[in-house]
């Protein structure tokens, strides 16, 4: 893709988002690469000047999800302030093909300006952990999308919920369980994300820095789907994980 195509496509994506249209696929003859995809994702920030980036999301960090999209690589997305749902009520009418992902979030305790060389150094950068739920919308005009298309559409990000923050504990020892109407919808081991939560965070931090993003205290990094992805259906839900505060939410 050339510069003009990148700008043009960033605008097309934003138009589709604002008009709640299916996420368009980039013309194949433009030959979009992963580098192009992240440039377009970054240009999307210019389309939303009043919508702060309050964190980052890992996508395709789970082998099962990677298989769905035919890739072996993770992807990075942005968490916008407008996507947060602190009231913990999700309107299903906001989605065309909504899905529920259960995840862990990690809260930064300091600014990071240089790549982190080791997991041990990384651990000192975070002081909080919480349960999170991400609501994605897989309303792509072509499914599954290519990896560049997924990245350009900010990894299908739509809305997210953040649980109460607890002091850092061993995240890889956690099992996340999603329940609704007395039934267990799924149960997943946090260790399944990129072979470990700290490994996932290590990749996310260094990838964000490589893309020119700023990592600031208070931002949350959501590491990717733990367990299977569930279709968005009306009901009351409870997400639990070890000693972390349960995350209770409703879909209407």
Regions inferred by a protein language model and the residue ranges of each:
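Catalytic-core "active-site belt" of small-molecule-metabolizing enzymes
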Residues: 2-196, 234, 238, 243-252
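A conserved acidic, glycine/proline-rich C-terminal tail/linker
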Residues: 197-232
């Amino acid at each position: 893709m050339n510069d003009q195509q990148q700008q043009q496509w960033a605008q097309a994506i934003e138009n589709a988002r604002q008009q709640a249209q299916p996420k368009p696929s980039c013309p194949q003859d433009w030959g979009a690469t992963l580098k192009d995809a992240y440039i377009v994702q970054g240009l999307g920030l210019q389309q939303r000047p009043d919508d702060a980036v309050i964190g980052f999301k890992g996508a395709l960090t789970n082998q099962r999800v990677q298989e769905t999209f035919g890739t072996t690589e993770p992807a990075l997305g942005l968490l916008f302030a407008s996507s947060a749902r602190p009231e913990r009520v999700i309107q299903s009418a906001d989605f065309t093909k909504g899905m529920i992902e259960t995840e862990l979030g990690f809260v930064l305790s300091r600014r990071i300006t240089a790549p982190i060389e080791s997991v041990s150094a990384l651990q000192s950068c975070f002081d909080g952990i919480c349960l999170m739920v991400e609501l994605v919308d897989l309303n792509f005009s072509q499914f599954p999308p290519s990896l560049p298309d997924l990245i350009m559409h900010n990894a299908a990000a739509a809305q997210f919920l953040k649980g109460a923050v607890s002091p850092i504990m061993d995240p890889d020892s956690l099992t996340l369980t999603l329940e609704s109407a007395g039934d267990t919808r799924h149960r997943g081991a946090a260790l399944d994300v990129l072979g470990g939560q700290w490994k996932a965070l290590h990749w996310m931090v260094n990838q964000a820095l490589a893309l020119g993003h700023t990592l600031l205290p208070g931002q949350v990094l959501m590491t990717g789907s733990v367990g299977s992805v569930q279709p968005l259906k009306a009901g009351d839900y409870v997400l639990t994980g070890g000693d972390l505060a349960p995350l209770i939410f409703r879909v209407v």
